[in-house]
């Protein structure tokens, strides 16, 4: 996703019909708040730059990344799209793999069931340093990328 955005800035022009009336949900994992807050700030910045009103950005906080799909599902009747933001850092057990698989499957299932764009802004890294590099560091901010993705999908959906 990010390499596409960096290489193709002309593709970032997103033409939304009546963007000031579109409500977008952002579900944020409370685990690793030093990462997820920066992801949220990046996503919110992109939405505001694309004329989504601040009062139409609905934030829902959940305990961890595993709860992101349920948080997204709760928002689907109130919004036109959802951005899921979280951070899972690999440890010494298989827990990482189970969480990453469950979250990615859950998010796509919510999207397909609700027929709404739901973006996957969950960092899955080996270290905290890698997560920091992807939440405003040298590898950009994946919260921004997730917001661009959901806006682009909204534009495609409304053609």
Segments from the language model and where they lie:
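Short, acidic/small-residue loops that bind anionic groups at enzyme active sites
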Residues: 97-124
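Short, ordered loop/turn segments at secondary-structure junctions
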Residues: 31, 62, 87-88, 123-127
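Active-site rim loops that border cofactor/substrate pockets in soluble metabolic enzymes
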Residues: 50-77
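Glycine-rich phosphate-binding loop
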Residues: 67, 71-107
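Mobile beta-alpha loop/short-helix "lid" or hinge segments that flank ligand
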Residues: 10-16, 114-130
